[in-house]
């Protein structure tokens, strides 16, 4: 209760709905942790590393790092309703790369599994993957492509109902929306 931010909500009814959902998610998560206690090494840990050949700095924050045998597991919490695969996650690949490079503040060890913990799926909350060298190389190709696009000021639109539905420019300025 003391950390709840009432001012973040425009409408009282919406705040009450979110508060109920938050309580349900936290209750289910607490039960899951009681049933499956992790060996937590760190929480909310910053990392930063440079990909020299691209002159690109990657930085971020890892939600949780656990000890799993002689390896470190990265856990990223998700509140989305839809589950996604850990295998194709660029985010998790970059977390693995940060551990490989010893770039996580106050944490060192060999990377192991990466885990997406879906809080809205208490019966089956985890989606995990261990990134091997080939997986990491594939994900780093994405970083290379994105950084090249940024340097060329190329930001291609990706129109779609989910992305575009709240866009103020959709109806009168967006040629990509018109084509779609």
List each language-model region with its residue ranges.
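A non-catalytic, helix-rich entry segment at domain boundaries
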Residues: 1-46, 50
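Glycine- and acidic
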Residues: 3-13, 73-82, 127-128, 153
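Active-site-proximal structural scaffolding
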Residues: 15-19, 57-58, 85-92, 107, ...
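Residue-level signal for well-ordered alpha-helical scaffold segments within enzymatic catalytic domains
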Residues: 24, 28, 93-97, 145
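Short, well-ordered loop/turn elements at secondary-structure boundaries
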Residues: 36-37, 60-61, 67-69, 110, ...
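Non-catalytic protein-protein interaction segments used by genome-maintenance enzymes to assemble
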Residues: 42-103, 142
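Metal-dependent nuclease catalytic regions and adjoining charged, substrate-binding loops involved
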Residues: 100-180
């Amino acid at each position: 209760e003391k950390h709840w931010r009432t001012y973040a909500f425009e409408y009282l009814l919406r705040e009450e709905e979110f508060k109920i959902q938050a309580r349900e998610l936290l209750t289910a998560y607490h039960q899951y942790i009681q049933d499956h206690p992790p060996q937590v090494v760190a929480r909310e840990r910053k990392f930063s590393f440079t990909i020299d050949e691209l002159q690109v700095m990657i930085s971020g924050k890892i939600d949780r790092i656990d000890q799993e045998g002689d390896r470190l597991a990265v856990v990223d919490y998700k509140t989305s309703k839809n589950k996604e695969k850990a295998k194709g996650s660029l985010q998790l690949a970059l977390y693995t790369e940060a551990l490989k490079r010893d770039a996580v503040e106050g944490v060192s060890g060999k990377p192991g599994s990466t885990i997406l913990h879906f809080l809205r799926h208490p019966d089956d909350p985890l989606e995990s993957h261990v990134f091997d060298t080939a997986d990491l190389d594939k994900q780093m190709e994405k970083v290379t492509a994105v950084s090249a696009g940024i340097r060329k000021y190329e930001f291609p639109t990706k129109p779609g109902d989910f992305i575009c539905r709240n866009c103020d420019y959709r109806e009168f300025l967006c040629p990509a929306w018109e084509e779609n």
